[in-house]
């Protein structure tokens, strides 16, 4: 059994016409397309609602959408399975999610990770070929898209449920792949907590844990009996939001999984962004991409590096997070500019920092703080 797994596959203004016309060669090139035609299963992350309506939800972040006609490119890919379990699947609310499901079903495209409630969304996908049963478990971090008992959406990662789900799936299948939509965007290493989560999935029996959210190639860890890949980059996702990040978003990995009598094997195929889509990397490009990838993977073997590097990464983001507590009014922006972006430091002191840490870190305060914010946002 051979499987290819790609990451974010999203039509945008740059290549929408190619998607609508089903011009798959323009999007991924003839060589890569021919490869996809030789495999038993092709898996990609559909990170956009397919809908012709405009019904955006209230959220923090962009509300994505793509016309239903863009399905014409997806249906050109043989043996296709789309995970829709991500932070953008509910950007257009229930109408957008329902439209996505309807369009995929009309074109006989298999999908998973979403549903009309959490019980439907948490169902895995099981693929069988030549007597081998492969289970695909999908979950996403919480960013306005998750289903619950009374709301449609994506299957949320839940420390009290997700590991048990994988353990149960392992008992039904020969191998299990976990598609975890999470991890910090544009960070090429695991956070300490993400590493713990992914390792726990392996300990529960998963053969491969693949993190899809970072928009960049991350690193690999071969842990116990399984493999963890902390970010594979985009597949086809062209947006101006990435313009200043070309050094890390222009390359990605197609993950190849081979299952035979000798076992479960994971390898990486480097890809390079084109003006309209993606292509196979040249031998020279592939060597450079994999050298950097292997270097980062080697660094991940050092537990102290994971902790210290993440501390440095946090220092570059903390002011952005704290600014949200001050608000987004024009007067705050003006004063922040006049103080050379030091307003947060001027207004918040040691006690405030400790208070915020306690509210976020302590389970009781965290739950109450979060529920209070949700109550405000629903008014």
Where are these regions (language model features)?
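Active-site environment of divalent metal-dependent phosphoester hydrolases
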Residues: 11-14, 50-53, 87-101, 118-123, ...
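Binuclear metal-dependent hydrolase catalytic cores centered on His/Asp/Glu-rich metal-binding motifs
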Residues: 14-30, 64, 128-176, 196, ...
């Amino acid at each position: 059994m051979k499987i290819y797994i790609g990451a974010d596959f999203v039509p945008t203004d740059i290549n929408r016409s190619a998607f609508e016309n089903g011009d798959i060669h323009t999007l991924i090139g003839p060589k890569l397309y021919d490869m996809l035609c030789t495999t038993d299963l092709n898996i990609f992350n559909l990170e956009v609602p397919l809908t012709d309506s405009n019904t955006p939800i209230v959220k923090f972040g962009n509300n994505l959408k793509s016309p239903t006609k863009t399905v014409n490119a997806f249906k050109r890919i043989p043996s296709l399975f789309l995970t829709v379990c991500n932070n953008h699947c509910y950007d257009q609310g229930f109408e957008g999610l329902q439209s996505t499901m309807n369009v995929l079903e009309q074109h006989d495209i298999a999908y998973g990770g979403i549903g009309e409630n959490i019980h439907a969304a948490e169902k895995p996908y099981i693929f069988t070929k030549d007597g081998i049963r492969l289970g695909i478990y999908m979950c996403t971090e919480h960013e306005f898209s998750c289903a619950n008992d009374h709301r449609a959406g994506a299957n949320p990662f839940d420390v009290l449920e997700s590991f048990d789900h994988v353990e149960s799936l392992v008992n039904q299948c020969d191998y299990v792949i976990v598609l975890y939509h999470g991890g910090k965007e544009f960070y090429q290493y695991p956070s300490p907590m993400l590493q713990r989560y992914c390792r726990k999935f392996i300990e529960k029996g998963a053969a491969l844990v693949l993190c899809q959210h970072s928009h960049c190639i991350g690193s690999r860890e071969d842990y116990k009996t399984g493999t963890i890949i902390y970010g594979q980059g985009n597949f086809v996702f062209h947006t101006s939001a990435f313009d200043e990040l070309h050094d890390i978003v222009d390359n990605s990995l197609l993950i190849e999984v081979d299952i035979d009598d000798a076992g479960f094997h994971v390898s990486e195929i480097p890809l390079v962004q084109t003006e309209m889509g993606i292509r196979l990397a040249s031998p020279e490009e592939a060597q450079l991409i994999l050298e950097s990838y292997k270097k980062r993977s080697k660094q991940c073997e050092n537990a102290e590096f994971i902790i210290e590097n993440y501390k440095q990464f946090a220092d570059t983001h903390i002011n952005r997070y704290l600014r949200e507590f001050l608000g987004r009014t024009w007067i705050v922006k003006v004063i922040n500019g006049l103080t050379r972006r030091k307003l947060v430091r001027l207004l918040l002191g040691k006690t405030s920092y400790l208070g915020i840490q306690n509210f976020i870190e302590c389970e009781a305060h965290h739950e109450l703080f979060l529920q209070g914010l949700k109550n405000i946002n629903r008014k």
